[in-house]
Design a protein with these regions (language model features):
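Compositionally biased, intrinsically disordered low-complexity regions
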Residues: 5-7, 20, 40-42, 51, ...
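Short coil-to-beta-strand
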Residues: 82-96, 178, 253-261
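Boundary/activation segment at the start of structured domains
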Residues: 5-11, 27-83, 91
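Short glycine-rich His-centered loop
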Residues: 78, 84-111
Length: 297
């Protein structure tokens, strides 16, 4: 019968929604990734900004090794808390240098070793300050243990030194070369003005003792270039340079002066600064300069 056959199949339309959904998910994931990357970059930048440089970390490590590990530093710090003035005395050279396997005697001349003379004078200065009662002196080295200049500076800094005096003797192959010079913190350092004031006191005192003053007044700035070559500027040259000076002077955290008392290779200089009597006279000169520097009598 007409019209009784199987009705025609209804057309079915299928809407494919899966592909747009996947696209939206992908875009969302990319956006989230970009956001996370941005946040990570900001955090990394901030961390790098607060992270110490290799040099800063090395200095911090030196201070950590010096601070709190030695009874002397603890004792000096305690005395400083009681109002005493901390003065660091640095005897140049001394001790066996493990890098070369031999003792760091410093310069040799006139039958003397620089390390012996500087330790003798430094110890005499220490004793005078200790007897005074207003000071808490410390030696950055004892002559038996080798300590790098950075470690010596770290010891002084850890003890809260308010002044550092580093004692040395000069050397020249020509025995006719002579004279006194001292080297304060350089103009680019915040400790320059006070270091220069102390250096001028010391130079004037040694000049009065009969020492020839090198340069214009016995006070000179010493710098080291990128190749570690030393060069000199006189004390009236206030040019701010980026090159470093002596490590013990630059890193101790207080006004500091490195003294080259005279030439160990010159007989006249040795007579004035390196004999037993001369070491006592030099120590007294330093003591008097320290009193003047701190306005004490």
């Amino acid at each position: 019968m007409a019209g009784t056959g199987t009705p025609p199949r209804e057309k079915t339309y299928v809407y494919r929604t899966g592909r747009p959904d996947r696209l939206c998910s992908l875009l969302f994931a990319v956006a989230a990734l970009i956001l996370c990357a941005g946040i990570g970059a900001v955090l990394w930048h901030e961390w790098q900004g607060t992270r110490p440089t290799a040099a800063e970390q090395a200095e911090a490590d030196e201070i950590e090794r010096a601070d709190g590990s030695e009874e002397e530093i603890a004792a000096v710090t305690e005395e400083a808390a009681n109002g005493k003035i901390v003065v660091a005395i640095d005897p140049g050279h001394g001790g066996v240098n493990p890098s070369v396997g031999s003792e760091d005697a410093g310069s040799l001349g006139s039958g003397l070793r620089e390390a012996d003379v500087t330790l003798k004078t430094a110890t005499l200065v220490y004793d005078k300050l200790a007897r005074d009662g207003r000071f808490a002196p410390m030696l950055t080295a004892n002559g038996t243990e080798y300590l790098k200049p950075s470690r010596r500076a770290a010891r002084a800094k850890a003890a809260g030194a308010q002044l550092l005096l580093s004692i040395h003797l000069n050397y020249d192959a020509d025995s006719g070369v002579s004279g006194f010079e001292c080297c304060p913190a350089t103009p680019q350092l915040s400790t320059n003005a006070d270091s220069l004031r102390f250096a001028r006191l010391v130079a004037a005192k040694f000049g009065a003792m009969g020492m020839e003053l090198r340069g214009i007044d016995g006070v000179r700035y010493i710098y080291f270039d990128d190749n570690d070559n030393r060069y000199i500027r006189e004390s009236n040259d206030t040019t701010v340079l980026s090159d470093p000076t002596f490590t013990v002077v630059q890193k101790c955290g207080c006004p500091a002066v490195l003294v080259e008392e005279g030439f160990i290779t010159n007989a006249d200089d040795v007579a004035l600064v390196a004999t037993d009597a001369a070491c006592e006279a030099a120590a007294q000169a330093y003591y008097e300069c320290i009193l003047t520097y701190f306005d004490l009598t």
